[in-house]
């Protein structure tokens, strides 16, 4: 176990603080409207020192959204380990999504950046995040489909329903 005073640990802690503050700004001001100077000012840093951790604003957006999708996939992993019941998976996945948002708002843990502006990113970053979001989306939609097959969820258009639920969760934040 490494020391919390090691350079690597300090770098990771500072990086996490930057991503968390940037995520909060992206959610309130929008990723397009937030500048690196905004992030630096909120952290009491110079813009120059921020460049030690991120290359560009797009890189910062990418890192925040990537962290968000990792957290969403982890929450689905937990849900899948807890239950095989598809309706319960839908409900628990939504509950976990809400918990992530509420924890962010209450200052517990890292702030969650709702991945709402992926389109502003360069092609390679955008494509990777879109693939990860689609993978998460398909997992969630699969819970709905399995529930319909088992008769515990009424017949619906699963793509539209999954999209509506996930979008509502991100926009309610």
Where are these regions (language model features)?
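N-terminal intrinsically disordered/low-complexity leader segments
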Residues: 1-13, 20
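Hydrophobic/aromatic residues within well-ordered alpha-helical segments
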Residues: 14, 57, 68, 72, ...
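Helix-turn-helix
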Residues: 17, 21, 25-59, 63
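Hydrophobic alpha-helical connector segments
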Residues: 63, 77-106, 161-165
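Amphipathic alpha-helical packing segments from all-alpha helical-bundle domains
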Residues: 70-73, 113, 123-150, 159-163
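Amphipathic alpha-helical segments used for helix-helix packing
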Residues: 89, 102-124, 141
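Hydrophobic alpha-helical segments that form the core
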Residues: 95-96, 141, 155-173
